[in-house]
Amino acid sequence: MERPALLQNGEIGTMESPTTRLASKPFPKPFSIESLIANQTPATATPPSPPEERDQEQEAEQEQELSARAMVASSALGLTQFPLYNPWLHGYFAQNHERLTHLIAGGCYLPSSPAGHPAAQQPQAQAQPQPPPPHPPTHALEKQLPPTLPHPLDTRFLPFNPAAAGVAPTDLSYRRLAELMNQDYVHSLSVHARLQHMAAAGRMHEDQANPGMAQLQEPTPPQAHSSPAKSGSHSPMEPALDVGMDEDFECSGDSCSDISLTMSPRNYNGEMDKSRNGAYTNSDSEDCSDDEGAQSRHEGGGMGGKDSQGNGSSSNSKSRRRRTAFTSEQLLELEREFHAKKYLSLTERSQIATSLKLSEVQVKIWFQNRRAKWKRVKAGLTSHGLGRNGTTSGTKIVVPIPVHVNRFAVRSQHQQLEKMCLSGPKPDLRKKLSAEAIGGFEKFSGSTNASSPSGGPVGLGVGVGVGVGVGLGVSTPLSLARSIY
């Protein structure tokens, strides 16, 4: 007699344990694993109950399951940005999360048949207690409720609201949503592509759910059936077509065209060739000195512009300029002009170029190289402490400078011709050299200039490739190798 009274009060189970009374409450305060275990163990120990009591137990379990899903959904909504996925892209994920929540709230992902929706299950549960419930709904509930356990990852990673949390995991649209969210390329798709993907997936699942209707619809509307097949076939290709075309990452046509033009391999190779040719054409020579760079640019921009324009096509076609082979006559004349004047004006350079049948650029480069060599010799003399007037004398004893053999022989011939035939400042230069040699090398001799006898021979011997030999007396002979630069 106590069981009907307990059933009228809404309590379930017997008076044996207080934990069974807690199971009758719709929303328990501490919802934990221990409470679930405590609720399930006495239910298994109780004897089989009538169908009405079983319906009430199922309603209570359904309410508990809905409350548990609501708690999981609220905790999942708190993690809108996924901290362990890509922390530097949280803004883009937040935008995708807002779009997906709008789509889910609008009902795009919900199924058309209200089989798993809680709002559709509650009226059925309220209408069932009057007649004895048939067994198929119980089997449907048993099929729906237990598979909630293998889907904790979906509820954790999918941002959905508690209204959509009641969807059963066995629903096809729910599984499709989980698959879409777990795929990597869903973040690179636009909203339009997602809607197309959703529509195609919904049509495919409807065809799978109703194969008879799909067979009836296949022969009659070929165009209407081709559109979902076309969209479904193109849906895997959507990421490749839609990457970079999202509204958040649009780029202007000019910038995209510039990037595509500059980064294409053909144009990249062309730019590299241009830069290399420009580097070779801008540099006049490989051994040009740095202090002559500004002057060479100024001179090249002056009257040398015509020759540079004339040789522009040939210099662009060739990667490197070949060395000019000067004749002996040209070298003699160039050496003579260099001894007379270290720097040339534009008019002098043009005159020398026309007389020697050379271009002004060749004359300019030869003078630059010659000045660089002259400065190296001067620096070597000053480091030895032997140069008094290095600009005019250029004296040295032994300075190992790599000089071409032909140029050295031509220079020695030029010195011989200059001493024997030419007139001008060179005899005075020879007198200066002899006087400076006598005064500058007194520390190497055993006596002073006064100690040399008045009748002592002071001879000037000219060697072929050696230079000038000076003998100071018979007792203190000293031979010096000199080359006039």
From Swiss-Prot:
Residues 1-65, 114-157, 212-325 are annotated as: Disordered. Disruption phenotype: Embryos display segmentally repeated ganglionic branches that stall and fail to penetrate the CNS and the segment-specific cerebral branch and associated cerebral anastomosis fail to form. Residues 223-234, 254-267 have a biased composition (Polar residues). Keywords: DNA-binding, Homeobox, Nucleus, Transcription, Transcription regulation. Residues 54-64, 284-293 have a biased composition (Acidic residues). Residues 319-378 bind DNA. One of its GO terms (biological process) is regulation of nervous system development. It comes from the Eukaryota. This is Homeobox protein unplugged. The gene is unpg.
